[in-house]
C-alpha cells in the first residue's frame, strides 16, 4: 500500500482537518508517514489567508514535482485555486468540507486520474471515532465551520463557506471519548467560535458547551478560539470566571484602532464598543489575558488612523498581539474595490513600531510573574533543549525537565522574565 505524508500549513483548524484526513486514509489501509521523503503521495493542507502562506505551498508543489511525487491539495488553497492547480502538476484537489472523500481521490490519483471534489460531507464525519491526535494530551476540536462576517480583507468566507455548527451532543461525545483515550486538554475551534450554535436554533451556544465540558472529569483544561467581538457573549466570560478548567485567555481580534478603517474592513463595531467589551470582560474575569490581531497598512490608512491603533495598544495592554501587514487577497472585497495605496516602506515602519511597543508591554506584564509559582501543563521540548508548558492565562514557561513530564501538570517557580517566554524551576509534579 502507498505511503502518504500530509504537510499542514496555517491555522489550528487545518491541523484538525489533517487529523481527520489521516483517519480516513488509515481506515482504507494507507500508511501515514511523518517523513516526506518516504512518501509516494504528499498532500498539502494549505492556507491562503496571506500571500506569504500561499507562496509557501506553491513553492512546495514545485519541489515535489521534481521528485515525481503524487501531489494532492486540501485546505483553503484548494477552495481558492480549484482546478487551476492541475496546471501545476497536482493530481487531486479536495475542498474544505469534502475530507471524508479523500481516499477516493487518492485511489484515482494512483490510477492516473485527476479529481476535484468540493461536496459538503462534514455531517458524515463520526468524530468520536477519531481518537488519534498529533498530541497525546491535547486535541483540536472544530465546533463550527465557516464564517458569515465577510470582512473586506478576508478570504475565509469564500474558502470555508458559511457558518455551520456541529450538534452539541456530537461534540461532547467526541470529548468524552478523547478523555478516555488520555486527552487532558481540548481547544474548541471556529473561524468565529462565538457564533457556535446560532444556526442550530436549539439553544446551543459556546457558553453552554463550555459548561458541559468542564464536567468531564478527565479534562483538565479547555481553550477556545477565535472570537469575534460582536458575537462574544458575556455568558462566555461568566463561564470562564466560574471554572478553574476554562482558560483565562480570550483572543479577541480588533484589527484596527480607527473607526474609519474598521468600517472599511466591515468589522461591524466601533472602537468604543470594543473597549467597552474589554472592560466588561475584565470586570467579570479580573485576571483575564486578552490577546488580539492587528493589521497595519490597510487601504487609506493615514498617520492619524495608525496613531489611533497605537493608542489602543497602549490603553488595552494586550498580553499578546498577532501583527500582519495588509496584503490584498484575490477574490476579497478589498482586492476588488480598494487601492492598496499605503507604500510598503510605511507599512513596514508601522509594523515595526507596534511590534516594539508590544514587546515593551509584554516585558512589563511578564515582570508580574517574577518569583511566583505557576501551574502549567507540560507540552513539549523546545529547540533550546528546555521543556515548556502554558499556564491558564496562556503564558509560556520554560524549564529544565524530561519527556516523562509531557502532558503532566507541574508547579514552576518563575526565576526569569523576558518579553517572550518566562523561565523557571519545577517545584512539584502534580
UniProtKB/Swiss-Prot annotation:
Cofactor note: Binds 2 [4Fe-4S] clusters. One cluster is coordinated with 3 cysteines and an exchangeable S-adenosyl-L-methionine.
Coiled coil location: none
Binding-site residues, [4Fe-4S] cluster 2: 147, 151, 154
Cellular component per GO, a single term: cytosol
Disulfide bond annotation, renumbered to this chain: none
Subcellular locations according to the entry: Cytoplasm
GO function terms (MF aspect): 4 iron, 4 sulfur cluster binding; metal ion binding; N6-isopentenyladenosine methylthiotransferase activity
Domain Radical SAM core intervals: 133-364
Chain ranges of the TRAM domain: 367-428
Residues binding [4Fe-4S] cluster 1, per UniProt: 11, 47, 76
Cofactor(s) recorded in Swiss-Prot or TrEMBL: [4Fe-4S] cluster
EC supergroup of this enzyme: transferase
Key word tRNA-binding present: no
Catalytic activity: N(6)-dimethylallyladenosine(37) in tRNA + (sulfur carrier)-SH + AH2 + 2 S-adenosyl-L-methionine = 2-methylsulfanyl-N(6)-dimethylallyladenosine(37) in tRNA + (sulfur carrier)-H + 5'-deoxyadenosine + L-methionine + A + S-adenosyl-L-homocysteine + 2 H(+)
Keywords, alphabetical: 4Fe-4S, Cytoplasm, Iron, Iron-sulfur, Metal-binding, S-adenosyl-L-methionine, Transferase, tRNA processing
Signal peptide limits: none
Pfam families listed in its UniProt record: Radical_SAM, TRAM, UPF0004
EC id: 2.8.4.3
InterPro entries per record: Elp3/MiaA/NifB-like_rSAM, Methylthiotransferase, Methylthiotransferase_CS, Methylthiotransferase_N, Methylthiotransferase_N_sf, MiaB_methiolase, rSAM, rSAM_horseshoe
Ranges for domain MTTase N-terminal: 2-111
Recorded family membership: Belongs to the methylthiotransferase family. MiaB subfamily.
Task performed by this protein: Catalyzes the methylthiolation of N6-(dimethylallyl)adenosine (i(6)A), leading to the formation of 2-methylthio-N6-(dimethylallyl)adenosine (ms(2)i(6)A) at position 37 in tRNAs that read codons beginning with uridine.
Assembly, per entry: Monomer.
Protein name: tRNA-2-methylthio-N(6)-dimethylallyladenosine synthase
Biological source species: Thermosipho melanesiensis (strain DSM 12029 / CIP 104789 / BI429)
Lineage, opening ranks: Bacteria, Thermotogati, Thermotogota, Thermotogae, Thermotogales
This protein's encoding gene: miaB
Amino acid at each position: 500500500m502507498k505511503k502518504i505524508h500530509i504537510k499542514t500549513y496555517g491555522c489550528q483548524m487545518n491541523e484538525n482537518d489533517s487529523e481527520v484526513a489521516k483517519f480516513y486514509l488509515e481506515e482504507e489501509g494507507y500508511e501515514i508517514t511523518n517523513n516526506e521523503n518516504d512518501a509516494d503521495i504528499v498532500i498539502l493542507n494549505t492556507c491562503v489567508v496571506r500571500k506569504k502562506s500561499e507562496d509557501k505551498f506553491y513553492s512546495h508543489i514545485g519541489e515535489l514535482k521534481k521528485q515525481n511525487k503524487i501531489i494532492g491539495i486540501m485546505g483553503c488553497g484548494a477552495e481558492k485555486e480549484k482546478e487551476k492547480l492541475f496546471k501545476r502538476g497536482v493530481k487531486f484537489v479536495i475542498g474544505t468540507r469534502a475530507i471524508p472523500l479523500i481516499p477516493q481521490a487518492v485511489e484515482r490519483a494512483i490510477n492516473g486520474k485527476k479529481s476535484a471534489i468540493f461536496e459538503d460531507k462534514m455531517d458524515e464525519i463520526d468524530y468520536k471515532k477519531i481518537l488519534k491526535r498529533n498530541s497525546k494530551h491535547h486535541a483540536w476540536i472544530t465546533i463550527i465551520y465557516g464564517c458569515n462576517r465577510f470582512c473586506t480583507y478576508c478570504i475565509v468566507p469564500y474558502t470555508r463557506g458559511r457558518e455551520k455548527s456541529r450538534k452539541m451532543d456530537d461534540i461532547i461525545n467526541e470529548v468524552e471519548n478523547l478523555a478516555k483515550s488520555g486527552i487532558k486538554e481540548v481547544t474548541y475551534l471556529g473561524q468565529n467560535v462565538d457564533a457556535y450554535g446560532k444556526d442550530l436554533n436549539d439553544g446551543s451556544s459556546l457558553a453552554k458547551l463550555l459548561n458541559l465540558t468542564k464536567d468531564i472529569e478527565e479534562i483538565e483544561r479547555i481553550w477556545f478560539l477565535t472570537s469575534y467581538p460582536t458575537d462574544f457573549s458575556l455568558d462566555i466570560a461568566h463561564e470562564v470566571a466560574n471554572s478553574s478548567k476554562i482558560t483565562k485567555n480570550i483572543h479577541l481580534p480588533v484589527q484596527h484602532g480607527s473607526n474609519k478603517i474598521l468600517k472599511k474592513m466591515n468589522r461591524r463595531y466601533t472602537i468604543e464598543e470594543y473597549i467597552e467589551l474589554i472592560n466588561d470582560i475584565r470586570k467579570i474575569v479580573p485576571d483575564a489575558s486578552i490577546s488580539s490581531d492587528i493589521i497595519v497598512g490597510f487601504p487609506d490608512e493615514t498617520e492619524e488612523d495608525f496613531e489611533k491603533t497605537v493608542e489602543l495598544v497602549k490603553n488595552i495592554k494586550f498580553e499578546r498581539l498577532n501583527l500582519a501587514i495588509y496584503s490584498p487577497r484575490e477574490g476579497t472585497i478589498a482586492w476588488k474595490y480598494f487601492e492598496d495605496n499605503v507604500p510598503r516602506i510605511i507599512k513596514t515602519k508601522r509594523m515595526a513600531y507596534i511590534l516594539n511597543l508590544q514587546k515593551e508591554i509584554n516585558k512589563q506584564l511578564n515582570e508580574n510573574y517574577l518569583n511566583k509559582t505557576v501551574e502549567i501543563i507540560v507540552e513539549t521540548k523546545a529547540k533550546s533543549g528546555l521543556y515548556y508548558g502554558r499556564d491558564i492565562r496562556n503564558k509560556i514557561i520554560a524549564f529544565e525537565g524530561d519527556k516523562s513530564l509531557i502532558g503532566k501538570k507541574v508547579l514552576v517557580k518563575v526565576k526569569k522574565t523576558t518579553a517572550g517566554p518566562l523561565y523557571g524551576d519545577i517545584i512539584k509534579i502534580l
